């Protein structure tokens, strides 16, 4: 009976698992994105690791410039914020096969990055969100951040499809 309960619980979590690499994006269809030329940063939920925060800001600045937006210290046409979250997913199949007394549960860290653009009235104009498994090798973090940020900005309303 316990096995059946664990199996059902596994299906529940599997069915709700996000697809890494997929981008979910929304935008205000009434907004004139071609008229937006400048942006300023506002606070979101910064990355826990300060180096990652700096990399995310740089990657978003690069991609924003790629869609024709110029960063201003204050007073931009819009504000941009980013939000991050990291969760550790436990590999339940591997967990059942291992010696539970001497080994830690196998996990994979799943990072989530959300970029939100708002107008002067704080109305959301565009948002994009993606998830990506994070390599435990911190040296690979800059490339992962850049790849995910590029992926997010492919959904920006004025960006021509490639």
Regions found by a protein language model. Name each.
Residues 10-62, 161-162:
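A structural "domain/chain start" motif
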Residues 1-4:
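Positively charged n-region of N-terminal signal peptides that target proteins for export
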Residues 18, 67, 76-131, 135, ...:
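Surface-exposed short loop/turn segments
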Residues 17-32, 108, 121-162:
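C-terminal/domain-edge helix-coil "capping" segments
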Residues 53, 66-79, 159-162:
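Surface-exposed patches in mature extracellular/periplasmic domains of secreted proteins
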Residues 42-52, 68-69, 134-139:
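Second-shell loop/turn segments in exported
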Residues 57-65, 150-153:
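Generic solvent-exposed, charged/amphipathic alpha-helical segments
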């Amino acid at each position: 009976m316990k096995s059946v309960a664990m199996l059902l619980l596994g299906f529940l979590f599997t069915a709700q698992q996000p697809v890494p690499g997929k981008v979910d994006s929304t935008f205000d269809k009434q907004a004139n994105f071609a008229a937006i030329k400048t942006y300023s940063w506002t606070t979101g939920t910064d990355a826990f690791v300060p180096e990652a925060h700096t990399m995310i800001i740089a990657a978003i600045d690069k991609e924003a410039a790629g869609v024709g937006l110029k960063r201003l210290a204050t007073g931009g046409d819009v504000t941009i914020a980013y939000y991050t979250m990291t969760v550790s997913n436990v590999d339940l199949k591997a967990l059942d096969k291992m010696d539970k007394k001497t080994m830690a549960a196998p996990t994979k860290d799943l990072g989530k990055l959300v970029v939100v653009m708002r107008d002067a009235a704080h109305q959301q104009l565009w948002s994009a969100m993606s998830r990506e498994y994070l390599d435990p090798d911190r040296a690979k973090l800059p490339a992962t951040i850049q790849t995910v940020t590029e992926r997010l900005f492919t959904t920006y309303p004025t960006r021509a499809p490639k």
